[in-house]
A protein has these predicted regions:
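ATP-dependent carboxylate activation and anion-phosphoryl transfer catalytic cores
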Residues: 1-162, 259-262, 276-358
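ATP-dependent carboxylate-amine ligase
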Residues: 2-63, 355, 553-556, 568-578, ...
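Conserved N-proximal alpha/beta basic substrate-recognition cap immediately N-terminal to
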Residues: 107-243
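Residue-level signal for inorganic ion chemistry
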Residues: 161, 357, 384, 422, ...
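Active-site nucleotide/adenylate-binding loops and adjacent lid/helix of ATP-dependent enzymes
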Residues: 199-273, 281-286, 290, 335-336
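Walker A (P-loop) phosphate-binding motif
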Residues: 210-211, 346-388
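Adenine nucleotide phosphate-binding catalytic loops in nucleotide-utilizing enzymes
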Residues: 294, 455-459, 495-620
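Flexible active-site lid/hinge loop adjacent to a nucleotide/diphosphate
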Residues: 395-512, 616
Length: 753
């Protein structure tokens, strides 16, 4: 049988806006012989398992004529059948790939990722013939799926919200668990799988079924307090049924659903189905509205006797229990619309504006620059970057969360009003996006890094990163000096594309993007100074390069580029030049602000620079920067080579660093399981030797702390000591060791050469 792999997305992703399972199939020539294109055995298996009726159409869509397409389409349609028979409302799928190729892929909609994944597994076993008796397995699957079923009314609210552009986040789906919201629910569960957040930040409301959890605590108590509800009814002035008649008696009872002060549906109690309310007695309507008004016009089901007396009300009505047919789905939609009206009224800004950043190098520095500009403009930005998650000025996480989980910490926080979200390729590839669109997106660079089994080429990496830029609405900001960024332009739909270049002129860039929508950010001489200048509909000089401390007078050309990307993004985000200039003049590359990125320490007689460059492009940029630093002494480097990269990558790091330093200490950052620890340093050494660096100028050291201490003891007055540790913990460890070092004039260490 073909080799089949599948992987779920629960949020908008690089492939689709829906939650989907991505299925990849690798076929062998023998598969076509083993599995003739005959649907009859599969259908018989489904009928015998009680899943299909004899007269039921299956598959729903015609199967392709080629074998790989036939097999893939049948697999996906079978998995969809299992889900829909278990009550999950799914139907979308697509099959991709060339019939002449041995690899095919498909996307299949799911309502809950574990159910979707299990459905694919069961479909795979069914089509391969591994399972011929399906009754028991499907019974188990169905029970599993029903337990994770999205309530119909919750689904209706989600659909209404998304049509209006209101974010809808299901809080019982990955990456969340209901228990995380016990502070809202009190540990109670009103509707299983019905916990839902609508809106971002301060605009958010949380629903459990149709009940709004951010309503007053008094209303929450009424959910389980029958006498309290009765007391409230009596306080409204409506006629209230005697306590002896509220649970029976000869009078017929009706329940009326009101949402936002409108009667939406009615049904006979206890077992009638919801239907249009029809013509109601004026007095009954008045009584219903009095109750709804007392409850703030939320969703409420009011039970009334035929004589007009009110029996009780339910603040968390369940509409799905009494829907007789699909015709009544219109009632759900109307209820959903009215509930969203009640929550948000005419408010348009239910979303938190987002600037999203990706790229191989420079994305964290650029994200931090953007955050600084937003803060200078008086906003309260939330930031997600490699160093952690920040809500306004407070760091709430110190780990890399540049993916959905970290992004949601910002988007769901009422402490911030703008989101600056760094996204690395792993987050995009494996998880998708916490938003369906952003205002501005940036791609700083695409270069050789993180290539291997999943992403094999730089071109494939560019396509993954491009998925973020494709979600930009107002502007996409791209590095025109990087060919892979430039290739993205034709795929983008943002209102404007801004091309950033440290070397090209505006006239040349204006012809490289979509006609009428291309802007640029370039360097131009103004009064004999290099300025960052934006060309939109007008020419806008923003800030002199020399006024931005992060550029080190323009010597850190990569930071000039990072700054230009941040400036352009904030300009098209709507910030004025004064705020942008103030932010960039205030932004500095110290360890507290940009840990591991061009951090200088000048307390000793020698200068110390730490930069956690991580790939050949970063190494080359660091080398060019160091070359421009004039010293009275020598230049030394300690580099942590990445042992979790292939030989070519590691040697390219060494080649990029050759010729810039008087001595090299090579150490390793991380290794493949089973690999010798000295593999990466030895490869760097080999590359340095090939580039003409003398062997006496290269030292290999196994221990990081020893390597740092050795280099510090090599330093003398006027020297420059450069530390290039790995990202994550190593940079913090190295910086702490640098600060704790006690300089001694005759410390020794390796012989100073």
């Amino acid at each position: 049988m073909p080799n089949i792999k599948w992987f779920p997305y629960t949020f908008p992703n690089r492939l689709n806006d829906r939650p989907v399972v991505e299925i990849t199939l690798h076929f062998l020539p023998a598969d076509e012989i083993q599995y003739p294109m005959d649907i009859a055995p599969i259908r018989q298996c489904l009928e015998q398992g009680g899943i299909l009726h004899p007269n039921e159409v299956f598959p729903a869509d015609p199967l392709p004529n080629d074998f790989t397409g036939w097999y893939t389409s049948l697999l996906v349609q079978t998995a969809l059948l299992f889900q829909s028979k278990a009550g999950h409302r799914v139907g979308y799928y697509t099959v991709c790939g060339d019939p002449d190729q041995s690899e095919r892929s498909a996307l299949m909609e799911h309502e809950q990722c574990d159910v979707g994944m299990t459905a694919v597994k069961l479909a795979t076993e069914t089509i391969s013939g591994e399972r011929k008796l399906l009754a028991k397995p499907f019974e188990q699957f169905s029970a599993f799926a029903v337990d994770r079923l999205l309530p119909v009314d919750t689904g209706s609210i989600i659909a209404v919200a998304r049509r209006r552009g209101i974010p809808a986040i299901q809080l019982e789906r990955q990456p969340y668990r209901r228990e995380q919201f016990d502070h809202l629910t009190g540990g109670d569960c009103i509707r299983r799988n019905g916990l839902l957040m609508l809106g971002h930040g301060a605009h958010q409301h949380v629903l459990d079924g149709l009940f709004c959890l951010d309503t007053s605590d008094d209303f929450k108590r009424l959910l389980n307090d029958k006498q309290g509800r009765r007391d409230l009814l009596q306080g409204t002035g409506v006629p209230v049924a005697d306590s002896g008649r509220d649970d029976g008696g000869a009078a017929q009872r009706y329940q009326y659903l009101l949402v936002n002060g409108q009667v939406v549906a009615a049904r006979p109690v206890p077992d009638g189905s919801w239907a249009e309310p029809g013509t109601l007695d004026h007095a009954v309507v008045e009584h219903l509205l009095q109750v709804a008004h007392a409850l703030g016009f939320a969703a409420v089901a009011v039970t009334v006797l035929t004589g007009g007396e009110v029996v009780d009300f339910d603040l968390a009505p369940r509409l799905d229990q009494h829907l007789e047919s699909s015709k009544n789905m219109v009632l759900l939609e109307r209820a959903g619309n009215l509930l969203v009206d009640w929550l948000f009224g005419d408010v348009d800004d239910t979303r938190m504006p987002v600037i999203a950043i990706t790229g191989t190098n420079g994305k964290t520095t650029t994200a931090r620059m953007v955050r600084e500009i937003l803060a200078c403009a008086g906003d309260r930005p939330g930031l997600v970057c490699t160093d952690g998650v920040y809500l306004d000025d407070k760091q709430v996480s110190d780990t890399d969360e540049c993916m959905i989980a970290g992004h949601l910490k910002v988007l769901t926080s009422a402490a911030v009003n703008r989101a600056v979200l760094e996204s690395h390729h792993t987050g995009i590839l494996r998880y998708g996006f916490a938003f369906d669109r952003c205002e501005v997106a940036i791609c700083t660079t695409v270069a050789d890094d993180h290539l291997g089994l999943t992403v094999r080429t730089v071109e494939e990496m560019a396509v993954i990163k491009r998925a973020l830029l494709e979600r930009a609405m107002d502007a996409a900001v791209l590095n025109a000096d990087n060919e892979h960024c430039l290739d993205m332009v034709e795929h983008l739909t943002a209102d404007k594309v801004c091309l950033v270049s440290t070397s090209s002129v505006a006239d040349d860039l204006s012809h490289q993007g979509p006609e009428g929508g291309t802007c640029c950010c370039v360097l131009e001489s103004v009064d004999d100074e290099d300025w960052v200048v934006i060309y939109d509909t007008i020419r806008v000089p923003v800030v002199p390069v020399a006024s931005m401390p992060a550029t080190f007078g323009g010597r850190a050309t990569f930071n000039v580029s990072n700054a230009m990307h941040a400036i352009a993004a904030c300009y098209f985000f709507g910030y004025d030049v004064d705020a942008i200039r103030a932010g960039m003049e205030r932004f500095r590359m110290d360890f507290d602000n940009t840990p591991g990125r061009l951090n200088f320490y000048d307390t000793y007689p020698f200068d110390v620079l730490m930069d956690a460059m991580k790939n050949p492009a970063g190494a080359a940029a660091l080398g060019r920067f160091v070359e421009q630093i004039k010293t009275r002494g020598r230049k030394y480097l300690m580099v942590q080579a990445r042992g979790d990269r292939d030989d070519g990558f590691i040697k390219a790091m060494g080649t990029a660093l050759a010729g810039q330093f008087d001595h090299y200490i090579c150490q390793t950052h991380s290794v493949y399981p089973g690999e010798p620890k000295d593999r990466a340093p030895a490869l760097v050494k080999a590359a340095l030797l090939e580039a003409g660096v003398g062997e006496e100028r290269i030292t290999l050291m196994a221990d990081l702390s020893e390597a740092v201490d050795t280099l510090l003891r090599m330093g003398s007055e006027g020297d420059l000591l450069v530390f290039a540790p790995g990202t994550g913990q190593p940079k913090s460890k190295v910086w702490s060791q640098i600060l704790a070092f006690e300089f001694e004039a005759d410390a020794g260490g390796l012989e100073r050469q």
